[in-house]
Amino acid sequence: NLFQFGEMILEKTGKEA
C-alpha cells in the first residue's frame, strides 16, 4: 500500500534525523 510505504519512509527519515 502507498500509505504503508509512506509511513515507513517517514519513520526511516525520523530515525535518521
Curated annotation (Swiss-Prot):
Superkingdom field: Eukaryota
Coiled-coil blocks: none
Gene Ontology molecular-function annotations: metal ion binding; phospholipase A2 activity
Keyword terms of this UniProt record: Calcium, Hydrolase, Lipid degradation, Lipid metabolism, Metal-binding, Secreted
Tissue/organ expression: Expressed by the venom gland.
GO CC field: extracellular region
Primary location recorded for the protein, binned into one broad class: secreted
Enzyme Commission identifier(s): 3.1.1.4
Keyword field contains Nucleotide-binding: no
Essential cofactor(s): Ca(2+)
Subcellular locations according to the entry: Secreted
Catalytic activity: a 1,2-diacyl-sn-glycero-3-phosphocholine + H2O = a 1-acyl-sn-glycero-3-phosphocholine + a fatty acid + H(+)
One record GO biological process: lipid catabolic process
EC supergroup of this enzyme: hydrolase
Co-factor: note: Binds 1 Ca(2+) ion.
Function according to Swiss-Prot or TrEMBL: PLA2 catalyzes the calcium-dependent hydrolysis of the 2-acyl groups in 3-sn-phosphoglycerides.
Similarity comment: family membership: Belongs to the phospholipase A2 family. Group II subfamily.
The protein's name: Phospholipase A2 1
Naturally occurring in which organism (per UniProt): Daboia russelii (Russel's viper)
